Amino acid sequence: MSAKQPNRKPTGKRKESDASALDGRERKRAAKRKGLKAGSRQQAEQSSKNNNGKQAKDPRIGSRKPVALIVDEKGAKPVAPKPAKEKKLVMTPEQELAAIENDDRLNDLLDRLDAGETLEATEQAWVDQRVDRYQELMDELGIIDNDDDEEDDGSFDDASYEAPTQPASEEELWDRFTQVDYQPEPKPEPKKK
């Protein structure tokens, strides 16, 4: 009988042919790469656009203005700065007064104040600024606003009216107006006969 040879366990890797090894390496490289091939995208664009052999000149390259290679003191002219133009719209005082009187935002905020609402600090500051400017324009133009002092319906008799003993100054009236608990000064009733 012949002696039985012991079973061999495979040692190492299985041998592959050159073609299968090359295919495996290519698949491994392709799996590692995630993006496009390396290269310049401008080259790819140029090759796709310019197939007719005629190359278009890039307008960014070069300059049309000649450059002096020698510094010449005569040729150097100081460039005068251009005067800055005022783009601010200048309004006459009459136009500005009309604009303030027709300002919807100001009218809405004044209506809210008359209704007893309290405004935010920024809104109140804006209203104060506009009212102050309105007063300045009225003084500048010499316009006196008498709409609040007299009634136009004619039911008011001057002879029966008694003036208050001491009229309130503008500062006192303004202080009362700016207070939260402002109460208007009561008007005296005309005397009955």
Swiss-Prot record:
It holds the Pfam family YihI. It comes from the Bacteria. Residues 13-26, 184-193 have a biased composition (Basic and acidic residues). Residues 1-12, 27-36 have a biased composition (Basic residues). Disulfide bonds: none annotated. Residues 1-91, 143-193 are annotated as: Disordered. This is Der GTPase-activating protein YihI. It comes from Aeromonas salmonicida (strain A449).
